[in-house]
Amino acid sequence: MLSRLFRFLTAAVIFGLAWSTFVEASEPGLPQATRAPVGGEASIPYGWVDFCNRHSEECTLGKLKPMDVRLTKQSWKILNEINNKVNNAIEPISNLDHWGTTLDHWDYPVDGKGDCKIYALFKRKLLIDRGFPRQALLMTIVRDLNGEGHAVLTVKTDHGDFVLDNLSDEIRPWTATGYQFYKRQAQDDPNVWLSLGGATGSAPGTAASN
């Protein structure tokens, strides 16, 4: 059974505007980013396969039409709202301490705890619940500033690719993270992962640990 935190947070952040209320023409004064270079197919993370075994509804969608988020002041506000709420609501804990295994366990924060994958998956779920196109919300594997494996959520927009990260309450262009980007989900199929070739953004001023 889902925890009270999970149910409450889910209900709280999906309440409000539907997607149709903020798909508008782009507005001035919004952030800009570039698009990460995407290569050929990459291996599928074990954690995603395991997640799909427990949440088949997320993984049996068939081919999807690629879509980007239309960035407006309202959609940017919602992205920041969800990024901050999730970052502050989940208690960080390592995969080993949480699940007692070194195998990556991907899931939602059913007990209010989790590591980077749990943060990213929950943000993805809540944004989908708010009407954002799932094709633009891509689980992404990187190496962080300490050279450790890390998962973030890439949001593809008409202003470029932005990163929602449990290590930062600021949503940043992918090039501003300092991370090495290795692979992420394809827009047309969440079960296909594409290589990012270890592309690296310019390092920000401060480091953070996973």
Positions of the model-derived regions?
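Bacterial N-terminal signal peptides
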Residues: 9-19
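A structural boundary/capping signal
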Residues: 2, 24-210
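Bacterial N-terminal signal peptides that target proteins for export
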Residues: 1-10
